[in-house]
């Protein structure tokens, strides 16, 4: 398989992550090109703003052609250490991996589920992404 890494449109912190993706892909026998029109597109984020705004054109074209897009994004767990990688998104719409995992990774990362807390102080404000994002 050939992967096309759109490194020109990545966030400032994307360089080492794109490089790690490339090293891993090559170790598995895949070809890698950069900022080309050949191969499976790999973009940084589905936030269409700033440096990453040009990724929207890549995303839209691939989705219209029914081609997958691999999306890399900052992770929710240990930000700056772990990264999200999904096919056709990074959150609710993405495909991440086969189901049926036993949950051992949670223990490996020392993640603990805490009990729900009631808020006695009033409302909770949820702030979501803006209109320049597919998230």
What residue ranges belong to the model's regions?
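N-terminal pre-catalytic "stem/leader" segment of glycosyltransferase-like enzymes
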Residues: 1-53, 133
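Catalytic core of nucleotide-activated saccharide and alditol-phosphate transferases
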Residues: 37, 41-135
């Amino acid at each position: 398989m050939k992967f096309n890494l759109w490194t020109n449109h990545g966030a400032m912190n994307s360089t080492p992550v794109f490089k790690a993706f490339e090293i891993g892909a090559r170790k598995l026998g895949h070809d890698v090109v950069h900022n080309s029109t050949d191969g499976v597109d790999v973009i940084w984020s589905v936030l269409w703003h700033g440096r990453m705004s040009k990724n929207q054109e890549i995303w839209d074209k691939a989705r219209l052609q029914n081609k997958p897009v691999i999306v890399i994004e900052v992770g929710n767990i240990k930000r700056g250490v772990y990264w999200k990688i999904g096919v056709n998104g990074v959150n609710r719409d993405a495909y991440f991996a086969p189901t049926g995992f036993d949950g051992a990774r949670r223990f490996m990362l020392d993640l603990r589920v805490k009990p729900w807390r009631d808020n006695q102080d009033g409302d909770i404000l949820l702030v979501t992404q803006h209109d320049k994002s597919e998230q």
